[in-house]
Amino acid sequence: MTQHFPTRQLRFFLTAPSPCPYLPERYERKVFAHLPLSDGATVNDSLTQVGFRRSQNIAYRPACEACSACVSARLPVTDYAFSRSERKVLARNEDLERHLVEAEATMEQFDLLRRYLLARHADGGMAEMTWPDYVAMVEDTAVRTHIIEYRTRPSDGGPGELVACALVDLMSDGLSLVYSFYDPTLGRRSLGSFVILDHVVQAGLAGLPYVYLGYWVRGSEKMDYKVRFSPIELLKAEGWTLMSSRDLRPKDELPGL
């Protein structure tokens, strides 16, 4: 697959090995480049299509020496058929309001993020995120970025309660979910799944063909949720390949095997 980058030649760097946050007893390395401020959106689009992810003004992808478990994943909007359970998730959250806001950090968002991290990822690297860290994650961007806030409908004329947020990049061919978080006490709403499903809906309404989910890591419980969405496309050596959830389940989990 050949990609032509519409900017001065990018310089790529390689990180030193560090413990893998997803798989035990493994080490990760990443190749990364700084996104140019002049045409960062266009460069990020091209890099995302070949497996990179954005973090602030850096685009990176895994470059591990003895492991290739991290695989870029995206949902094909046109081909996506919502399952019965997914339609129920969408229906359970019909009472929420969606607000598109500028990529500007607020303390309300940060408070929700802290509650989410402490409940769901207390042992992860982001658990110690500070307010300046969050501001940088949201606002340090060279691409078209915004935040989707999901709120309950207000009863007194003021803003409703913030229950979920998604930091999203608007790309030429889709929406890229950079990071999402939600109220961990509202389990019945399945807010994590809802945010992804709602972005499939919104991408379809906008005529965008893909929703990018980042990396699926086979064998990582933290990342297994991504392949519950089907159909899904994974970036393989031969390019983006359409898969079903059945294709990605271990053989010992398939009926009759």
Swiss-Prot record:
Is NAD set as a keyword in this record? no
Instruction: List the subcellular locations.
Output: Cytoplasm
The keyword Glycoprotein is annotated on this UniProt entry? no
The reaction(s) catalysed by this protein are: N-terminal L-glutamyl-[protein] + L-leucyl-tRNA(Leu) = N-terminal L-leucyl-L-glutamyl-[protein] + tRNA(Leu) + H(+); N-terminal L-aspartyl-[protein] + L-leucyl-tRNA(Leu) = N-terminal L-leucyl-L-aspartyl-[protein] + tRNA(Leu) + H(+)
| Source organism, top-level taxon | Bacteria
- Chief location category: cytoplasm
What name has this protein been given in UniProt?
Aspartate/glutamate leucyltransferase
The source organism is Phenylobacterium zucineum (strain HLK1)
Which gene does this sequence derive from? Answer: bpt
